[in-house]
């Protein structure tokens, strides 16, 4: 077993009444209902141990500003192993699909880290590649999107980035 530290960033969190109306526990099983509501009731901007194996850090804020060094109020940007990029389509949320954001996400991923998104458009794939990722198109989930993208920060890319930084000092 591995311990999981999950950070979720939500600009417009759902009200508890809306969560109850959605009734997701009937999909995940009533045995998980208590955990489901514990996750949603966890306080914002603080780490919460949901179980000995799962720590949750919910951030209420604008994702595009949290990783912007000029606008960011947090003192340090954490590093991640996996980023599940679940934004609306580029036509609906263009600010979430800018090259500078993918460049930053690349930087906050650990070596070998993965970014995955349901948006498999060519323009998104090319932006991820420009940021330095190795990108693969994979079959989407059953009953959902036809394809997804998996972008990996490869060892070679990470080594080149590290070598470039050390040569600048």
Predicted feature residues:
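Short SAM/SAH-binding signature in class I
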Residues: 56, 78-87
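Conserved SAM-binding motif I beta-strand of class I
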Residues: 5-10
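Class I S-adenosyl-L-methionine
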Residues: 121-169
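Conserved beta-strand signature within the Rossmann-like core of class I S-adenosyl-L-methionine
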Residues: 82-84, 111-119
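Short glycine-rich, flexible loops that bind phosphorylated cofactors or substrates
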Residues: 91-92
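A short glycine-rich, Lys/Arg-flanked "PGG" loop and its adjoining helix->strand segment in the class I
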Residues: 95-111
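A short helix->loop->beta-strand "cap" motif at the edges of active sites that frequently abuts
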Residues: 2-4, 109-113
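S-adenosyl-L-methionine
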Residues: 18-73
């Amino acid at each position: 077993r591995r311990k999981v530290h999950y950070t979720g960033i939500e600009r417009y969190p759902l009200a508890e009444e809306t969560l109850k109306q959605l009734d997701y526990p009937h999909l995940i099983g009533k045995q998980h209902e208590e955990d489901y509501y514990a996750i949603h009731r966890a306080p914002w901007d603080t780490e919460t141990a949901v179980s000995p194996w799962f720590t949750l850090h919910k951030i209420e804020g604008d994702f595009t500003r949290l990783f912007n060094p000029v606008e960011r109020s947090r003192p340090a940007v954490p590093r991640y192993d996996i980023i599940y990029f679940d934004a609306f389509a580029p036509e609906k949320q263009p600010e979430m699909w800018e090259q500078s954001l993918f460049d930053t996400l690349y930087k906050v991923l650990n070596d070998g880290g993965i970014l995955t998104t349901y948006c498999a458009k060519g323009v998104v794939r090319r932006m991820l590649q420009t940021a330095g990722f190795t990108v693969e198109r994979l079959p989407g989930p059953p009953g959902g999107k036809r394809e997804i993208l998996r972008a990996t920060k490869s060892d070679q890319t990470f080594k080149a980035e590290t070598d470039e930084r050390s040569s600048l000092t």
